[in-house]
Amino acid sequence: MELSSEDNLRLNVLLRNQPLAIRIDESSMVLYGLSEKGEAKVQLNPTCRDDQYLRIVRELLSGHVLGSPGGYPVYLQRWTRMGQTRDENLEQLLLLGEPEAVIAVACATGLTDELARRAWWTAQDPDNARRMLRNPAVVKGAMGPELAQFLIEYLPFETEPEVIVESLRL
């Protein structure tokens, strides 16, 4: 199994243009790249089952970004939620199209306001917003009010009391 030639070309062009972050909409099979100029969109054309094809796409991204052809390294998945990722790799993690990599960035102690903006573009998730708001640099930056506003608007949809209290505390 391999990428279609069209997808391979488009993804390599996207990566050559040095995107700031990448996200994948798995339901519509679209890959988005964030750049200084805006957003690029690549409609994926699977040559096999969608889940297998997405794995191949992520392997290409990982091979280009980290030099790891097997996809997002398993050992990093264990470290991410503990904030044990190295700060110099945070920008690279946002190029993998992996939800767990975005969590790694959101949990990192070296998270900056700009990296928080990119991570938020990649995965607008209330848990990620709470993770990022634990970082003083994000709270003081431009993303702090945006994330806080999102959590306030999302409060009616929360069902867990602990999560509601945590959102209000932040």
Where in the sequence are the language-model features?
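Alpha-helical scaffold segments
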Residues: 1-170
